[in-house]
Every structure is written in C-alpha cells, then in structure tokens.
Amino acid sequence: MFNTMFECFKKESMLFELIAFMERNSDGFTESRSNYNECLNMLRKELGNNAAVSVDEFDAALHDAICSDLVYSAYLGFKANLDYYENPLANNFLEVDPEIYLREGTAHRLPAYDKAYAKVNAFYEQLSPELKEATDAITDYESHLETVGPKLAHYWAFKKANSFFPKVIPGYCASIPFTYAYEHMLAKYMGITIIQLNEISIDATSEAS
C-alpha cells in the first residue's frame, strides 16, 4: 500500500532499511559503522555519567538529522516526478549536480535538522581537544549516510510516485525511459546493479528488528 508522502516515515524503520541496504551494497560502510560504534564506546568510557549531552543522546540526534534529510529528499523525489511530467524539458534533474536537486542548503535549515544538530554540536563542545581529534570515525560514518541516504530516498520516492500519481492526477503517465535513466545513473554511481538498487524501501512498512 502506498503511504503518505511526508508524515508516515518511522525513524527506526528508515534507519534500519538504509543501514541494511548500505551494508549490502556500499563499499566500506560495514567497516565504517563498526568504527563508529567503537568510537562511541570509547567516548562512553571517557565521559562516564557526567556529560551534559550523553553519547546515547548524541547518537540519537545524529540519526535524527540523517532522517530529516531522508524525509526532505523523499518529498523532493515526489515533487521531481510531478515536475518532470508537467514540463520535462525544464525539469531534467539528471543533468545537474545532486547537491542542486537535493537542495542541501535548504535541507540543513529545516527545523528537525536544526534541532538535531544543535544537540550534536552541544555534544562536541563538551569534548576535550584530544577527544575531538579521536572522532574521525564518527565523521566518516556520518559522511557515508549523508552522501548516499538522500540520493536513495529521492530515488525511492520518485519511483513510488510513478504508481501513485495515476490514481490522483487525470492523464498522468509515468516516464519509463526517464525512470530507467535515473536508476541507471544511480546504480552506476553506487557501483551496483539496478536489481540491487531496487531492493531499497524506506517507507514505514519496513520493520526494524
């Protein structure tokens, strides 16, 4: 069943599916995630129970920020599909940099992202210079999720729109050639097959274990 565009996403389900997908298909991600968890464990030992922002609060906030990106990118994917249908010549986003069609500047000014990153920044501010230097694994892990996650969310929503818009827009017809070009471009970017790419499903029906 098709789910509501914006409000149906469950943070736990989204993260579970994204992380599981990347562990299967993204080179270096499994090691990056392992290093991230080791870094968090080190910080727990160093900070103890006296931290103003705990490691667990930091971990949750970091993933909240990622989820904010995913939701916004999914919205943009739905919108891009309709924009392309209405005016394909003016809305071929495959010809521009992903930073443009994912609107990263706007994504990182959204209230949910701001709230989450305020907590992230507060956590870093309490670290000593030595501990800050030991957080490269966090930066690497976050970079993996921020680089790939929004692209996958945008693509997933774009394809979902192909089957949803005919139900609500008279005369709508999905552009199969453009959809194929999109999935081919993204699969090539990730170094995977189109079949592997289409295993992604970040809606609320995905259940985390």
Segments (PLM) and residue ranges:
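Extended oligomerization regions of viral-like shell subunits
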Residues: 194-200
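Intrinsic-disorder/low-complexity detector
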Residues: 1-193, 204-209
